[in-house]
Amino acid sequence: MVDIKKEQERDELHRAIWAIADELRGAVDGWDFKNYVLGTMFYRYISENLCNYINSGKIDAGNTDFAKMRDEDAEEAREGLVEEKGFFILPSELFCNVRANAANDENLNETLERVFRHIEESAKGSEAERDFAGLFDDYDVNSNKLGSTVAKRNEKLVKLLNGVGEMNLGDVKDHSIDAFGDAYEYLMTMYASNAGKSGGEFFPPADMSELLTCLGTVGKTEINKVYDEIVA
């Protein structure tokens, strides 16, 4: 049953990625496309991760849904959240809220650029600073590849946000697959040939990784150390 669920989730994710690729066809080449999809997926993930963390009561940010809080009120929890999570996102800059306003935001490119800058800056001084530094550098919201005018670029960005927003990623803990890892592998496989590369240059095949994991854990109930000799 687990394998069936895994394949269903993987197929659904692949269809969603292909739908976004179809929407952006002729605008962004495959090698750049992966940066936009993965960057948007990560933006959604950390937004939802932060909201879930706060709304579950793991930090006191008031008795309300964090996504619906005023930025001014949320600021009171910034220091504690950066210490706990390594980053901070204002409610107005969460993925769900930016996406909700995207179609009517004539300056969506500037909005996303500002949001990404704020996320990276929020991690400064924390243990996660190096992880967030330059995180969205390859996500060029002003690239002519998205369109010849700001309006056309924003139109593509709206489609990108909606495409990722409609992905059924659910709760990470409830999924049998690593959505981000699987999306990365799928994107590499889709577009590596266009860049004169092979997907295997960037990741070991999933089947090989799963086989080695099974062989290495046969008869074991606990794992103390892991050595990956084919890690990329």
Please identify what each model-predicted range represents:
Residues 209, 231-232:
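Short, compositionally biased segments
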Residues 221-230:
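Conserved class I S-adenosyl-L-methionine
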Residues 1-221:
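Non-catalytic, mostly N-terminal accessory regions of nucleic-acid modification and defense proteins
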